[in-house]
Amino acid sequence: MPSPFSHFELVVIGAGPAGHKAAIEAANAGRKVLLVDRDPTPGGECVHRGTIPSKTLRESALYLSGLKQRAAGIATAELGAQTKVESLMKRLGHVQQAHERFMRGQIELPGVSFARGRARFTAPHELELALPGGGRRVVIGDHFVVATGSRPRLPAEMQIDHEQILDSDSILSLIYLPESLTVLGAGVIASEFATIFQALGVRVTMIDKSARPLAFLDPELTERFVKSFQAMGGTWLPGRKPISCRFDGVSATLTTLEDGATVCSEKTLVALGRTASVAGLNLEAAGLSTNERGYIPVDANMRTHVEHVYAAGDVIGPPALAASAMEQGRRAARHMFGLPLHTSVERIPSGIYTIPEMSCVGISEEEASKRHGSALVGRAYFSELARGQISGDTEGMLKLVAEPGSGKVLGAQILGEGATELIHLAQLALVGGMTIDTFVDNVFNFPTLAEAYRVAALECIAQRAALRLAS
């Protein structure tokens, strides 16, 4: 029999970035909160199988491959199939444990309880938790946040066995580096792993039906990204749709393309999207359902069509980034308890941890032109900056977009090492309603990559002056 029920003002299902942030926000507002997760520690996919592991692997790849040193003209050893994976996994474990401790510490607040178990709705305001020891617990909630994340989509025709044909979870369990790897997909996960393994000396072939990877980004950035990937030795096959993949039973994986071609490699990573993790939740009992893509639909405040139930993070679909998930969880908690909201979705940066990094915030040149008729666009290439020449990061660039009349900053897109850090200057400019003149009227350290803002702003100012003269 289930144990006697407990009552909470908010029950959060899933302790990843979205759920974790929702719980903290509600607790800070003085609410009684229960945070539920199937794992023994908070963190979710982000810490255990997603963001933290892949980004740690990326940093290890940069270090072990000597890419930074090579860019500066320093000789390094070659990597390949003999590279020890144990050291990579050991470092990954240390980072995961440290972040788990951090997240655990953050929820040690008055009013927050953490429970391990698998949750399922039994009524609109009632959950039943299946506990690790076999018992059950009934929980009553005034409000709910569903933040159960997502899992890799596993097309049946790809014959994923998690040993030869992998998904984005099982690739983190490799015990050695393969000589070759086929990556199916062109989204964030596919692009990140393709460049990481190429940097580690694996021969990578990336295949997708789309014309370019990361199609939601500015084409200028993705064009440079592809050139960089190819310069590392990677192969990019655009406009080629994979229709099946199988292991030959001996030593190779065979990917068949729609045009009849076959691509052979030692292992294959299938990264053809993700789907919401809602199996077993019994959403129907709460009056919930998923849309045609398998995600839980929400409004701008993360509320579902059931008034007391919210959803946040990967479970609601794109952009499926940790930073946006955190803000969605925070937004859900603040809205349900009537707390003020100030954050705009356009001010949340996106970070893509490929090699090299890419990041953007605000709107693109294309979107700015649609909204304002035209746009001021300034570019700065790292090859023109003293810091870029010193570090050898000459492939990077920054693109700044501003209103044609006022010069108000509308967005920025960056490619290059440190892009995910540099983007925050543009984010602050957006939040503060600043103009391009701000970047020229203030002094930057020299030499730094942040100078790219000043260079790009000067180009925007020149365009603005030309427009004024023409009118």
What are these regions (language model features)?
Residues A23, A27, A194, Q198-A199:
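Gly/Ala-rich phosphate-binding loop of Rossmann-like dinucleotide-binding domains
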Residues P2-F8, I24-R31, D37-L177, T205, ...:
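Glycine-rich flavin
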Residues P4-A18, L177-G187:
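Beta1/beta-strand and adjacent pyrophosphate-binding region of the FAD-binding site
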Residues V11-I13, A119, V139-G149, V183-L184, ...:
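Short hydrophobic core segments
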Residues F8, I13-A18, A22-D39, E45, ...:
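Flexible, glycine-rich terminal cap/loop adjacent to redox cofactors
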Residues D161-L177, T262-H335, A429:
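FAD-site-proximal beta/loop scaffold in flavoenzymes
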Residues A231, L257, N291, V298-A300, ...:
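Short, acidic, Ser/Thr-enriched surface-loop or helix-capping motifs
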